[in-house]
Amino acid sequence: MNITNTPTSPVAIITGGAGGLGFAIAERLVRKGARVALFDFNEEALQKAQRELGEPTFVAKVDVADRTAVGLAVEAVAEAFGRINILINCAGITGYTNIKSHEVDLEDFNRVMRVNVNGCLNTFQAVVPHMLRQEYGRVLHFASISGKEGNAGMLAYSTSKAAVIGMTKVQGKEYAGTGITVNAIAPAVILTEIHTIMPEAQIKYMTDKIPMKRCGTKDEVAAIVEFIVSPEASFTTGFTFDLSGGRATY
């Protein structure tokens, strides 16, 4: 599968792109000839990512929950590269975990929703006008298996990812005739930096539900993402791809 089938090198914005899944995806797309713009709140990690990926990688310190900052960063990418072909929303936080719903802190719940849900909408609304003018675009939102099935002790995260799946269904239908596809991906546990801060009991709880009895890898995620955002993936929209080792079969 080759994303360079477009007339010119595709330009991809990747939120949460300085580390974890976002960076793994960026590495793969760059190898395939894409130009990438990484949005992240960690400036030090952004600079490191830019050095490793090389020029002409674009980086911007952005809180995706900040609508104004997102808009400015997207316009800077469009000015730098002349187009935006791909949007991959990887930025996300788990919030507090291993807590029952009646004990959930509302401030933390709202913070997770702002980043995980509003963040996807903020970038989508800033990028899609560019895609509409081009009559082409690929949007991929990162959901989670917890958004499909719910993980006990993770109310904020599970709720936010269920919302992302719902958003994807709506957007897929709304833009189906425009040349823009909008899809989501729902991984189970993937070994990334975010899981190093989760309690071991929570990781075991999630891994035990996977029939393959293992975590997924960043390379496995990057491989399927490459296809979803490619020109070849032209007849699938509003869909949530699973990457769950057999945990979800629907």
Where are these regions (language model features)?
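The beta1-alpha1 cofactor-binding region of Rossmann-like NAD(H)/NADP(H)-dependent oxidoreductases
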Residues: E43-E44, V62-A73, L106, D219-E220
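Substrate-binding pocket helix/loop in short-chain dehydrogenase/reductase
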Residues: N98-S101, D105-N110, H195, M206
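Alpha-helical segment proximal to the catalytic Tyr-Lys
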Residues: P129, K173-G177, S234
